[in-house]
Design a protein with these regions (language model features):
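Short, acidic, metal-binding catalytic loop of nucleotide-sugar glycosyltransferases
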Residues: 22-33
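A conserved acidic beta->alpha catalytic loop
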Residues: 23, 40-48, 90
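Short aromatic/hydrophobic "clamp" motif used to bind/position activated sugar donors
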Residues: 83
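Conserved donor NDP-sugar-binding/catalytic core segment of glycosyltransferases
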Residues: 95-129
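Non-catalytic, C-terminal membrane-associated alpha-helical segments of glycosyltransferases
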Residues: 236-243, 253-300
Length: 300
């Protein structure tokens, strides 16, 4: 077994999950060389068996809600030296697994890496939402590879580090994360929109001596339902992401901002309402929510 694909799902949308599984069925890597583990993370009702066509797919349950719990369970249940983390709304390019193996061989020090995440929107997005596409795990860092070497302790988060959607992990890098003490970082859990787990994996592997990288040869389609472009959702998402982002940087000693007294957070948020003119429109309100999340993440 050369590659293990881990998909963590909590009450997934049936149509989007079907697209994800169809993308796996279309992989160019021979089925004998990879496996897929679908982790049912406290779905209600439990996930039904998928339709035939993926003989190398297993479903296991993880009753503790939260993406970190589901990922840890998946990593412990898989066997391959190379792991691909996919979401239940990701459609991997047909050569994704083959490319992941090829790139891992070319870059033996890359412990975590990813590539392009291209949106497929259920409804056409309003022009003003483009500013916030990064919040939706959409990215394209260009046509060339980008590598951050782990030769020295990081002073900042490596900007070429992979997002969770399609992240490729070497087993040894993943093991460093599994063996590390639980830092208590918030991650996706039910309706909560925090996401510190991706950063924690990357920074733990980086500290263990593994490079992190972006390779444009890797590509996936990210299925975006209309509800994720609603202003209220984007506001909650930005607040949760910014808070957990700062907490992850702080836990790993690479946060560029000083800690703040808890009592000072609310007055700063009030001031930021005016600084960012949060009343002036949806985009301004979403930006302000991000500032609020960052301030909450810095509170000690």
């Amino acid at each position: 077994m050369k590659v293990s694909v881990i998909i963590c799902a909590h009450n997934p949308h049936a149509g989007r999950l079907a697209r994800t599984l169809a993308g796996l069925r279309a992989q160019s890597l021979p089925a004998a060389d990879w496996e897929c583990l679908l982790v049912d993370n406290a779905s209600t009702p439990p996930l039904a068996p998928p339709p035939p066509g993926l003989p190398n797919l297993r479903i296991i349950g993880e009753p503790r809600p939260g993406l970190t719990h589901a990922r840890r369970r998946g990593l412990r249940e898989t066997a391959a030296d190379l792991i691909v983390l996919a979401d239940d709304d990701n459609v991997l390019a047909p050569d994704y697994l083959e490319q992941a193996l090829h790139l891992a061989a070319l870059h033996p020090r890359a412990g975590t890496f990813g590539g392009r995440s291209t949106p497929e929107f259920e409804s056409p997005p309003a022009a003003w939402t483009r500013e916030f596409f990064g919040l939706l795990a959409l990215r394209d860092l260009g046509p060339g590879p980008l590598v951050a070497a782990a030769e020295q302790p990081p002073r900042a988060y490596p900007m070429c580090a992979p997002i969770g959607a399609g992240m490729v992990l070497r087993r040894a890098a993943a093991q460093a994360w599994l063996d590390a003490p639980d830092r208590g970082l918030p991650d996706r859990r039910g309706a909560e929109l925090t996401s510190g787990g991706d950063n924690d994996i990357v920074l733990t592997a980086f500290a263990a001596g593994w490079d992190t990288a972006y390779f444009p040869e890797l590509g996936l389609i990210h299925l975006i339902p209309a509800g994720r472009l609603e202003p209220a959702y984007l506001a909650r998402l930005n607040r949760g992401i910014q808070k957990s982002w700062v907490q992850a940087l702080t836990r790993h000693g690479v946060c560029p901002w000083p800690a703040l007294p808890v009592w000072s957070v609310a007055p700063r948020q009030f001031k930021a309402w005016f600084t960012h003119r949060a009343w002036s429109g949806a985009a301004a309100r979403i930006r302000w929510q991000g500032v609020c999340g960052r301030l909450e993440g810095l509170a000690r």
